[in-house]
Amino acid sequence: MLKVNNLQVYYGGIHALRGVSIEVNQGEIVTIIGSNGAGKSTLLNAISGFLKYKEGEVLYHNTKLPLNPSKIVKLGISHIPEGRLIFANLSVRDNLLMGSYLRKDKVKIHEDLENTYTLFPRLKEREKQIAGTLSGGEQQMLAIGRGLMSSPEIILLDEPSLGLAPLLVKTVFDIIADIRKMGKTLLLVEQNAYKALSIADRAYVLEQGKITLEGSAKEISANPKIREAYLGSKK
C-alpha cells in the first residue's frame, strides 16, 4: 500500500534520513520507534509532502507520490502531526470540518462528522466550544478526528500520547485500535514504545536517521537490546 524506498533527507548540512526504506500494508498498524532526534517525525513529514527529499521515492498503491501535501491528502493519506496543531480560535465543529476542506461530497462529509462524534462522544458534547479551551486529551481527540474527516485510507500519526496523563494515554491507544477496526491503515510514530508495540503488527527501529531493525512487533518487543533501550528492561 505504502512503500518508502531509500529516502534521503537533509536539513541544511544535517543528513536527517539516511536511506530509509519501510513498507505499510493495507489494514496494518506499523510503528516507528526511536529516540528523540532519530528522524521519526522527519520521515512522516517527507511522506506527507511537507519536506522535500533529495533521493529515494514514496510509493502509494505503486504510484510515486507528488511533493504536494494537498494532493497527498486527496489521494487518501492523512497526517496528524505532533503537537496537535488545532485551530485554537475555532470551535470543535469547525476544526473537524477543516479536515474535510478538500472534499466536495457534502452528504458523506456530514456522515463522517456524525461517525467522528460517535467515536469521540466528548467532542459531540463540546462541538460549539472553542478548541483552545479543551484539555490536552480532548485536543488530541480533536486532532485525530480532524484527520479522519479527510476520509483517509492511511493515517500517519505522530506522537499521539505526547504530554498526556497515563489514563488518557490508554484512551488514545484504545481509539487507535478502534480506528483500525474501521478499516484504516496506520503508520504510528510514538516514543512510548511499550504502548506502540502492544498495538502494532510490525515495527521499525529508527536510529540516527537509519533503520537498524525491523520485524513483527512481538519480535521487536522480545529483542534484548530493544527492551533495554526503549522498554526499560534489561531482561
Specify the residue positions occupied by each region the protein language model found.
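Glycine-rich phosphate-binding loops of nucleotide-dependent enzymes
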Residues: 1-235
